[in-house]
């Protein structure tokens, strides 16, 4: 997966390549099922009262793959138009206007280590502050 042109910032949590790399791997696997229509459904929620979504499903149901797919589609950090053009969402011209247009915060909670809850939260907050400061140095945090 390559970085998008013009993107100088790529952080640990903000605009990381992780969702794009992980989704591209999944999309190239033998048993891949195209569920990109979900992206169009999520895009319809932007700016509405239903913009906050909680997806609760049993283990091994594909929640992480869906999160990676959405992050890969929206993130400014990776050029993924070629990948998604081959999938169902590629036929949705309205949805494709959103591809690679957004800053994405991607947190893999299983990769953040800590000894207690407060330091766990502090580690996430510190990493996010660093990324935001790199991306927006003129803003006070």
Each PLM stretch: what is its role?
Residues 2-141:
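Phosphate-binding site recognition
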